[in-house]
């Protein structure tokens, strides 16, 4: 089994308990980070009528937050799609949001027309894409000129110190144990800290975005560098 297929199968296995585990393990902070990202994009992008796709959508958390943010910012979502390669995750998403179109596909091969989107989001999923640069090129292809890409991701810590040490201890020791209890799959939650450590630094990822045809608009670090928000415009 190829690396990407193994990752997809892992998410299939933890899909039934994914939402519960996320809320507990992040102490609800992931919802706050998502809301801040969506609201920031809505404030930067001036069009009122929007076509949005959420890639690696999982169980659909971002779909709901996009809808809430549009209502709050007096925007109109003409169409919103959720795309994910995990059938298990999509089964949960479809139950939660029966009126939303969900598509089983990978980020590196999107079944979307070129220049068809205003906004594309991917939250805590880009580090799980093996062909990441191909995926970024796909994001640029499906976005209209001036369209917005927003990426939320766990990134490597850039500073040492007590807070960084606490973060590492939590990720490597506490999170896998609690995640394993909730999901009955400890190895899936051991994968998380390893995937973060194997991901890019902030500067490296920004360079990849630029090479894919994007211009950075905003960057923000949340919760002492635990999570990072990248907002970029397609040139």
Curated annotation (Swiss-Prot):
Which PROSITE patterns does the entry link to?
A: SAM_MT_UBIE, UBIE_1, UBIE_2
Keyword Transferase on entry: yes
Q: What is its EC number?
A: 2.1.1.163, 2.1.1.201
Please give the InterPro entries that the UniProt record associates with this protein: SAM-dependent_MTases_sf (IPR029063), UbiE/COQ5_MeTrFase (IPR004033), UbiE/COQ5_MeTrFase_CS (IPR023576)
Q: Where does S-adenosyl-L-methionine bind?
A: 59, 84, 123
Record bears the keyword Zinc: no
Catalytic activity from the UniProt record: a 2-demethylmenaquinol + S-adenosyl-L-methionine = a menaquinol + S-adenosyl-L-homocysteine + H(+); a 2-methoxy-6-(all-trans-polyprenyl)benzene-1,4-diol + S-adenosyl-L-methionine = a 5-methoxy-2-methyl-3-(all-trans-polyprenyl)benzene-1,4-diol + S-adenosyl-L-homocysteine + H(+)
A single GO BP term for this record reads:
menaquinone biosynthetic process
Q: Which SUPFAM superfamilies does the UniProt record give? A: S-adenosyl-L-methionine-dependent methyltransferases (SSF53335)
Return one GO MF term.
2-methoxy-6-polyprenyl-1,4-benzoquinol methyltransferase activity
Highest taxon, organism lineage:
Bacteria
The protein's annotated pathway: Quinol/quinone metabolism; menaquinone biosynthesis; menaquinol from 1,4-dihydroxy-2-naphthoate: step 2/2; Cofactor biosynthesis; ubiquinone biosynthesis
Q: Mind telling me which Pfam families this protein's record contains?
A: Ubie_methyltran
Xref: Gene3D superfamilies: Vaccinia Virus protein VP39 (3.40.50.150)
Q: Which UniProt keywords apply?
A: Menaquinone biosynthesis, Methyltransferase, S-adenosyl-L-methionine, Transferase, Ubiquinone biosynthesis
Main role? Methyltransferase required for the conversion of demethylmenaquinol (DMKH2) to menaquinol (MKH2) and the conversion of 2-polyprenyl-6-methoxy-1,4-benzoquinol (DDMQH2) to 2-polyprenyl-3-methyl-6-methoxy-1,4-benzoquinol (DMQH2).
The entry's family comment says: Belongs to the class I-like SAM-binding methyltransferase superfamily. MenG/UbiE family.
Q: What is this protein called?
A: Ubiquinone/menaquinone biosynthesis C-methyltransferase UbiE
Gene designation: ubiE
């Amino acid at each position: 089994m190829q690396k990407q297929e193994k990752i997809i199968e892992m998410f299939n296995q933890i899909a039934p308990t994914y939402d519960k585990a996320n809320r507990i393990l992040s102490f609800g902070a992931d919802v706050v980070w998502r809301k801040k990202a969506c609201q920031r994009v809505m404030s930067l992008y001036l069009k009122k009528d929007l076509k949005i796709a959420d890639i690696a959508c999982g169980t659909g958390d971002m779909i709901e937050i996009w809808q809430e943010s549009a209502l709050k910012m007096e925007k109109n979502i003409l169409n919103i799609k959720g795309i994910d390669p995990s059938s298990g995750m999509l089964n949960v998403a479809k139950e939660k949001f029966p009126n939303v179109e969900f598509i089983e596909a990978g980020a590196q091969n999107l079944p979307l027309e070129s220049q068809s989107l205003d906004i594309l989001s991917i939250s805590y999923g880009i580090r799980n894409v093996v062909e990441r640069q191909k995926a970024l090129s796909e994001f640029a292809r499906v976005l209209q000129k001036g369209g917005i890409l927003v990426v939320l991701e766990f990134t490597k810590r850039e500073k040492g110190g007590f807070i960084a040490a606490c973060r590492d201890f939590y990720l490597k020791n506490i999170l896998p144990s609690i995640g394993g209890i909730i999901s009955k799959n400890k190895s899936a939650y051991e994968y998380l800290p390893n995937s973060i450590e194997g991901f890019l630094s902030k500067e490296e990822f920004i360079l990849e975005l630029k090479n894919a045809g994007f211009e950075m608009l905003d960057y923000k670090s949340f919760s002492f560098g635990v999570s990072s928000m990248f907002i970029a415009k397609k040139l």
